[in-house]
């Protein structure tokens, strides 16, 4: 398997269209989507930002802060250009916190993405000429549920796409859009779940991070909790984000305690735990599966950010992370020449390689994304502006940026997602609006 290869789903998994499903009880409503290719038909009110509670006060940067690492990454003209071709609005009018394209589809399959917000999960299909078609909508039985995050995978037996969703109630739900059912759910976290991620090479390994200060690794094939990361040296406050590296050997997590922590899952102990989770069969034993409790991260730092760290992603062996300080920081544990796999837990050095600067993004829970090939980086701010950086540059100082704005998009953009072929960028906002930007070739 080449470095950036993800197993794809065979054909024959087209999703049934335009159905509204209940996640567990009866509820009748149809999403009234004011989507139209005609700009003037789009109703978007830009208003106050609905922040997730307890937003930290954003303290101005301390003097001399900008001389970090090798200084600012000056933005030159980006080679990518996008055009806004459509927007629509979900009828619940609550913030949409998450959006994800399904990257497990085959070439030629329709481009499907999911949005989450309020107690709603909605699936859409992108068509030519900017059309966004509603496929399915799911409503949680609890009106107080608020979904924050979603992640796609596929069933390794049937090849059906699967969507995991979670939020304020701390329950992970797995939805099969082919059968249009919530096929399983996991309860374990003691509080809200802020992010879900599937392992890049094993479609059954699901990582969840929570307000309960811990990360959990689940095997959704055998319904086992493989490990809990947290405790003695774990996060001291909500975990807000985490990411697997490309090979799925390491996890980097971050949270409200301003820290970033590295957890290796290719250790003997963890490899064994994952193997045992596959071997476990509750029908053949009375004993419950024993989950690993990982109290000590393999590296930890609080030297990158001075506020809540709400998004982290691997870029090769480097880390991209952001706080509510108007910059995404590119850094690595240890010194420049150190091998990431030889970093010791006692390592106190970090090397900051540069920053992607932007403005008006000082509320928390605003997440950036990259395209499949990690050639582009996208982030929205709290006044509806999108920043796209070209990562394909020799020198990161020369990272080129393009900003995308539309006069009717004025609400906070919570998350963005690129289609697998990078042709479409979707942004979701606090006013329940969805914006489609198509890349101009």
UniProtKB/Swiss-Prot annotation:
Species source reads Bos taurus
Q: What is known of its domains?
A: The WD repeat domain mediates recognition of trimethylated histone peptides at the consensus sequence Ala-Arg-Lys-Ser. This is achieved through an aromatic cage encircling the methyllysine, and involving Phe-97, Tyr-148 and Tyr-365.
Where primarily located? Answer: nucleus
Q: How is it modified after translation?
A: Methylated. Binding to histone H1 'Lys-26' promotes mono-, di-, and trimethylation of internal lysines.
The protein here is known as: Polycomb protein EED
Q: Where is this region: Disordered?
A: 1-72
Location of the region described as Interaction with EZH2 in the Swiss-Prot/TrEMBL record? 81-441
**Where are residues bearing N6-methyllysine located in the sequence?**
66, 197, 268, 284
